Curated annotation (Swiss-Prot):
InterPro entries: DUF309, TTHA0068_sf. This is Uncharacterized protein aq_591. It comes from Aquifex aeolicus (strain VF5). Keywords: Coiled coil. Residues 94-122 form a coiled coil. It comes from the Bacteria.
Amino acid sequence: MLKHLSEKFIYYMAEYFFEFEKRKHYYKLANNLYNSYLKGKKFNRSLLKKVKEDLNLWIDNPNQIQVYSRFLNEVEKEGVKSFGEGLAIIPLINLYREVWRELEEEQNKVEKLREYILKLDSCEICTRGLEGEEFFNCLTQNVDFLTATHIANFFFEEEFLPLNEEIAQILNISKENYFEVIKKLKGANLKNLYGALYVLLQRDSVKVNHVKRLLGISREAELLKEAQYAWNTGDFYRAHEILEEVWGLFKNEEIKKCYRGLIRAAIALHRFKEGNPQSGANVVKQALLDMANCPDNFRGINLGEIRAYLEEVLGTKEIGNPPELKYNIKSEE
């Protein structure tokens, strides 16, 4: 199947993957961080910040975005301390669903992520003079097969085809027949081929979000509908998670600040419900500071009503009956 895809077709699909979906940024960041580790040079902090801000473009799980953001914050603060930290961002994003299965049930998800990066660190020895199957087999002794395909492609774009679980399953590619497949693709840009295969075969909401953006369908309105249901049914924790994803859609600091106020309002109400009024009141204060200069009708949301309610909560330390979250953004805006 793969050898019948024309170079022009692969190029345009890869162009969509790397340019329109902006994935070129985290590939550039990986190269930049790896070179920083290798040569002791400063890394591009503005690029790291951009990738951190755009994580929601490639990952549909707000909790996972938070974990990855904490990892990138550590790198920004402390620098690139290891081989694994240098190139981790590529498999972390490209295999985000596979990685999340490892993190999901862990209480300390950041610590579990560090374990994943430690495994990447152990692959450094494979880069010292090994090539071809010997190089790849060394990688698979330290990390899982899918992660190995992404590390191998990082170093040899025309020799190793990156894979994720869904693409591997659809094309019946496994560790056992991997070299049989890639030998037939010799000379092709396999990083571009991965991008093309992802666009063609991967089924996930992130890709759908990009298509909706092309069609002018508002992701903000869709998420607010989910947040409205969670808030109005009293699931304030879930509401805060969804609102965090809305927050991540914007670059404008004034809009982000108003949404941050709503996020903190949801967190505060969750803490009140959990029987922690002191902590809840502290977060209410932060929410009100964020909302101070926001319009009452913020992007169609009844923020003024929520703000007035929070001021009452601050005085009584009781949540009473929270106002419903309402919005009137049209889906096609």
